[in-house]
Regions:
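Conserved GNAT acetyl-CoA-binding A-motif
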Residues: 119-130
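Glycine-rich phosphate/pyrophosphate-binding loop shared by adenosine-nucleotide-utilizing enzymes
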Residues: 4, 64-68, 94
Length: 172
């Protein structure tokens, strides 16, 4: 799709990001995942922190913000311990969190993952066991299921890992 731009989020984007997160919460609820993002998650402070740390990005189509995601490099504390499996490797990685779409265009997950894969050789992501739509999208982008991690609040998430070196080796 043409006319797609990905750039870091700014404070000026906050109102639009909140709208997009609201749309995403409603979509998750309607598609069998009503408990992943509850009570207004993510809160304004978390969104602002992501922006201020340079981890929040927006996907723009024809000058309109249509999606957002967090791409953070470095060790994610919730990924230090994985149950019922193992990460593909111990290489440095980036983590994708809080990906959300306005629903205005298709393919935003693909655009975000291509962006992440261009910047990092190893990318990790997790999702709720009820989020079948996201699980399918993650697997379609070449991620491998690795096991279960626990969020800071103790909730379980299914953990996935993309490694460029492993994906390239499996194609040969």
């Amino acid at each position: 799709m043409e006319n797609i731009v990905i750039r870091p989020s700014t404070i000026e984007d906050l109102a639009r990001l909140k709208q997009i997160f609201s749309v995403a919460r409603n979509y998750m609820s309607k598609t069998g995942n009503p408990t992943q993002w509850t009570d207004g998650y993510p809160c304004d402070d978390l969104i602002m922190n992501d922006i201020e740390n340079g981890d929040s990005y927006v996907i723009i189509h024809d000058s309109s913000i249509v999606a957002t995601f967090v791409l953070r490099s470095g060790i994610d504390p919730t990924y230090k311990i994985i149950y019922e499996g193992a990460w593909l490797n111990d290489n440095p990685y980036a983590t994708v969190h809080r990906i959300a779409s306005s629903g205005e265009i298709k393919g935003v997950f693909h655009f975000a993952m291509e962006f992440a894969k261009q910047k990092y050789s190893d990318v990790r992501i997790d999702t709720h066991s009820d989020n079948k739509v996201m699980q399918h999208a993650i697997m379609r982008e070449g991620f491998k299921y690795c096991g279960i991690i626990h969020c800071w609040n103790g909730d379980e998430r299914l953990a996935f890992h993309y490694s460029k070196n492993i994906c390239l080796a499996s194609r040969q």
